[in-house]
């Protein structure tokens, strides 16, 4: 999955071992390791210890759309989008899952995005949006 997706997103595979692959981009690197055999039947659970989701930035809205189309052609589950949201001016994104259920996002935010203002990000008007169930 990642060996097809990451080069499409501009990352270069610099290591491809038996159980580990490493891709590098301009300011991003991802190392992905095959899970141990005893865990192969498990799925990712967002509220367990670890990652909530990983977001990759695109250079344009068109690149977001192209990535979504690529993932559809790969049979990936697209959870939502591409859509625009109020997280930041021009915030355009989609959320998808890899084959293990790990949630990822690809977005485009024009200009400096969330770094353009001192106002903190507010993904929801619900003050408890980030509380675990």
List PLM regions with ranges:
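A cross-family glycoside hydrolase active-site/sugar-binding cleft signature
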Residues: 33, 55-57, 81-82, 107
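Vicinal oxygen chelate
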Residues: 44-133
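Short beta-strand/turn micro-motifs at beta-sheet edges
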Residues: 38-44
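Core segments of cupin and vicinal oxygen chelate
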Residues: 1-36
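Short, solvent-exposed coil/turn segments
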Residues: 16, 25, 47-51, 87-89
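Acetyl-CoA-dependent GNAT
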Residues: 34-38, 109-111
């Amino acid at each position: 999955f990642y060996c097809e997706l990451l080069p499409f997103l501009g990352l270069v595979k610099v290591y491809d071992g038996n159980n580990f692959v490493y891709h590098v981009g301009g300011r991003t690197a991802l190392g992905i390791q095959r899970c141990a055999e005893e865990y192969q039947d498990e799925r990712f659970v967002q509220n367990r210890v670890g990652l909530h989701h990983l977001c990759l930035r695109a250079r344009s809205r068109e690149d977001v759309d192209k990535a979504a189309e690529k993932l559809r052609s790969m049979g990936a589950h697209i959870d939502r989008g591409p859509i625009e949201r109020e997280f930041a001016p021009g915030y355009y994104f989609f959320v998808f899952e890899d084959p293990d259920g790990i949630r990822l996002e690809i977005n485009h935010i024009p200009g400096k995005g969330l770094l353009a203002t001192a106002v903190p990000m507010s993904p929801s008007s619900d003050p408890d949006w980030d509380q675990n169930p």
